[in-house]
Amino acid sequence: MKQVKWILAVLAMSAAVWSGPAWAAGGDAAKGRTVFEKHCAACHGPQGKGDGPTGAMLTPKPADLTSAGTAKKSDADLRTIIEKGKPPSAMIGWKGQLSDGEIGDVLAYVRSLGK
C-alpha cells in the first residue's frame, strides 16, 4: 500500500512539473518580441498594454497583456487564445500563420511583459 502511495505521489509531482510553464520556459522571449512587434503590436501596443493604433478602433479593446488578469491565465489558456483567437473580440487565431515555435516565443514574451 505504501508503494502505491509513493508511486501516486511521484506521478502527481511529475504531472505538476510537466504541466508548469513549459511553453513559456521553452520559448525565446527575444524572438517572441520580434514576432510580437510584427504581428501583435498594432492592436496590443508596443508594450502590450492594449493601446496599439489599430486597437484604439476596436470594441472590445485588445487585452492589456501586462495586467494581473493576463498574469493569472495559465500558459495553456494563453496559448489557446494565441492559436485560436478569442471571439467575439477581434483577436484572430494565429495557428497556421505562426509556427508552434513562434507561438511559444510569443507566449514567453507575453509572460515577460507582466514582470
Regions found by a protein language model. Give the residues of each.
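Extracytoplasmic electron-transfer domains, predominantly the class I c-type cytochrome c fold
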Residues: 59-113
